[in-house]
Amino acid sequence: MANRGPSYGLSREVQEKIEQKYDADLENKLVDWIILQCAEDIEHPPPGRAHFQKWLMDGTVLCKLINSLYPPGQEPIPKISESKMAFKQMEQISQFLKAAEIYGVRTTDIFQTVDLWEGKDMAAVQRTLMALGSVAVTKDDGCYRGEPSWFHRKAQQNRRGFSEEQLRQGQNVIGLQMGSNKGASQAGMTGYGMPRQIM
């Protein structure tokens, strides 16, 4: 964490709860997918939250990832710099976040730059990468590389269109219980709060 000291009291409890949401198994799956998706010579980071953060912190891996989800020549981030300057790295992270939102990741699934840069909420980073993978699998445009079962396929809109004639025919259907004194009834039911009468 950049210029922040240790947190105490309620802040410490909140930070511990956030840290408990981090999933080490999910980290391994995401690292494998990113390396496979980018298809470049990206080194495999050592396991652990701190190493995962350091691996993604400069933004180059994230920018390569989002570029690999587009056809060649249509990459959203044309220039990726491997700079050691903090502002350049944070700028690349924010470029990735904007490109991920344009790609189809919901705003509620996107982490904030400080979550990754300061390591405040690495679970949010994992959620964003999972959402990005889900959108990539759902699009099924040939740019996704990896096992399709690694991510959930998002539900697609499936609108039904009914003609006026079909809607009129639906009004003529008699409900199954109309005109019947059998089936569901309210016999024997009492109002809320009333005692049951046993005689």
UniProtKB/Swiss-Prot annotation:
Organism in which the protein naturally occurs? Bos taurus
Point to the regions of Polar residues compositional bias.
178-188
A GO molecular-function descriptor: actin filament binding
Stretches forming Calponin-like repeats = 174-199
Provide a GO biological process annotation: actin filament organization
Say which family it is in: Belongs to the calponin family.
Task: Identify the Gene3D superfamilies for this entry.
Answer: Calponin-like domain
* Phosphoserine carried by residues: S163
Q: What is this protein called?
A: Transgelin-3
Phosphoprotein in keyword set: yes
- Alphabetical keyword list: Phosphoprotein
Residue ranges for the region (Disordered) are 178-199
Q: Give a GO cellular-component term.
A: actin cytoskeleton
Entry-linked InterPro entries: Calponin-like, Calponin_repeat, CH_dom, CH_dom_sf, SM22_calponin
- Upper taxonomic classification of the species? Eukaryota, Metazoa, Chordata, Craniata, Vertebrata
